A protein has these predicted regions:
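General N-terminal targeting signals
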Residues: 25, 48, 102, 131-133, ...
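The AdoMet/dcAdoMet-binding core of the Class I SAM-like
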Residues: 1-84, 94-100
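Short, surface-exposed linear patches
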Residues: 21-25, 53-55, 72-75, 107-110, ...
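Soluble small-group transferase modules, centered on the S-adenosyl donor enzyme superfamily
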Residues: 116-198
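C-terminal substrate-binding/active-site "lid" region of AdoMet-derived donor-dependent transferases
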Residues: 42, 61-142
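A near-ubiquitous, low-amplitude feature marking generic local secondary-structure context
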Residues: 19, 23-26, 58, 86, ...
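A short linear-motif detector with a strong N-terminal bias
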Residues: 9-12, 108-113, 150-152
Length: 198
């Protein structure tokens, strides 16, 4: 895990045990307190999964250059051939879709497979948008039964409070207004022309 803010990570360890469920004590976990982009630029490691969970790109904020075509290119180059990246991409309220559409459009400049999805995030009180991007793996081609089998092979399905085969299919089946926002957006976010959310 790469996070620029060591203090926030420590506070999460202390105060959010129900969220991390001991993941920080897992011997496979390494926490690096540094800039994620800088880390990807210098590492030669390859990853099966990269999860990008950022604050939105606010003016003068640290995340502005972590939503760009160039950053997504770094992620692509650090994924294994079957690797995937997933990220949060803002709320999916009907009149708040420019950011979601621009992230999708930018990812399509870099990855051959981009699968937008959404889920309800109770602490935000609204549906929230996410993206999955890869060099070839497409989660929309998996049946509910296949997803349930994959989950059961890796962990106890009863420990998951949300995801199963049905939720998987539902999340990737976007309502018409959301599909249109993704298809019609032509904004490509770059280092030279970052998107700022106000």
């Amino acid at each position: 895990m790469v996070d620029i803010d060591a203090e926030v990570v420590e506070e999460c360890k202390k105060h959010l045990p129900e969220m991390h469920q001991g993941a920080f004590e897992d011997p496979r976990t390494r926490v690096l307190n540094e800039d994620a982009r800088g880390y990807l630029e210098k590492t030669s490691e390859r990853f099966d999964l990269i999860v990008v969970d950022l604050v939105e790109p606010l003016e003068e904020g640290p995340a502005c250059l972590l939503f760009t075509k160039e950053f997504y290119g770094l992620i692509r180059d650090r994924l294994t051939d079957q690797g995937v990246m997933t990220m949060q991409a803002g709320m999916t309220k009907i009149n708040e879709l420019h950011f979601y559409g621009a992230v999708s459009r930018t990812l399509r400049e870099v990855f051959p497979v981009v699968a937008p999805y959404q889920g309800f995030v109770s602490c935000f009180g609204t549906p929230w948008g996410f993206m999955l991007a890869s060099k070839g793996t497409d989660p929309r081609r998996q049946s509910a039964e296949e997803i349930d089998r994959l989950i059961a092979a890796r962990l106890n399905p009863d420990e998951l409070g949300y995801w199963n085969g049905g939720a998987h299919l539902h999340s990737f089946n976007l309502p018409k207004f959301l599909s249109q926002a993704v298809e019609r957006n032509d904004r490509v976010i770059t280092d030279a022309n970052p998107l700022i959310v106000s």
